[in-house]
Regions:
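Short hinge/gating elements
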Residues: 6-9, 25-29, 74, 102-106, ...
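Dynamic helix-loop-helix/coil hinge segments at AAA+ ATPase domain boundaries and subdomain interfaces
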Residues: 10-13, 62-84
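Interdomain "pre-motor" coupling segment immediately N-terminal to P-loop NTPase/helicase cores
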Residues: 17-68
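Conserved P-loop
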Residues: 83-161, 208-211
Length: 215
């Protein structure tokens, strides 16, 4: 069925041009299945909602800085059978994000901590949450740079806005001033306001030795 010459510009004017992608297909379905006008309109609007949802998800994932291949589906649980798969499936529901709770992933290098951290963040993005993935060292360098040009507060906001912040590779090396203070301020500001996923090759009991000045 040929589209009306007026229909295309009207849909674009209403920012509904995505409907054009499935309009002809839906027209054929409507004729074959004898849909009512209301059913036909509902299918078109469902298509538009789905398209917009996928577009928004793609934007959230891009802004989060996540590797699209790091998902729970691509993680090799057989490689490290000590990982509690059921617990990760539960975390993938993202209830911890809704409750502003935190997740710590510890283990030796090469055990998949970063992969799992990104996978959980992707699941959160799929549920409508904003995420940001960044190595701890890179974050601290960025905050430190803000002390030189008086942009520290603005830079800190970058890490307070996301619903879930993934801090990768904490503990690779000791922290020197002002890094401990910056990290403390960040965690303190996010406490009960947003979630953190922290990956580390050191157990929490070892963390105090990373700080030159205990907090």
């Amino acid at each position: 069925m040929e589209l009306s010459h007026q229909l295309i510009p009207q849909l674009k004017h209403l920012r509904l041009s995505g409907i054009l992608e499935t309009l002809e297909h839906r027209q054929q379905e409507a004729i074959q299945q004898k849909w009512s006008y209301t059913d036909f309109l509902q299918r078109l609007l469902e298509d538009e909602v789905e398209r917009r949802g996928q577009k928004q998800l793609a934007l959230r994932l891009r802004r989060a800085g996540l590797n699209s291949t790091k998902t729970l589906e691509t993680f090799d649980f057989d490689f490290n059978p000590s990982i509690n798969r059921q617990q990760l499936v539960h975390l993938a529901e993202s209830e911890y994000v809704r409750q502003h709770r935190n997740v710590i992933l510890c283990g030796p290098t090469g055990t998949g901590k970063s992969h799992l951290g990104q996978a959980l963040a992707q699941e959160a993005c799929r549920k409508g949450f904003q995420a940001l993935f960044i190595p701890v060292d890179k974050l601290l360098k960025h905050l430190h740079g803000g002390r030189a040009d008086d942009s520290w507060d603005r830079r800190l906001q970058t890490y307070l806005r996301p619903d879930v912040l993934i801090l990768d590779d904490f503990g690779l090396k000791p922290l020197t001033p002002p890094a401990p203070e910056d990290l403390y301020d960040l965690i303190n500001e996010r406490y009960e306001q947003g979630s953190i996923i922290l990956t580390s090759n050191r157990a929490p009991a070892e963390w105090p030795e990373l700080f030159g000045d205990p907090l």
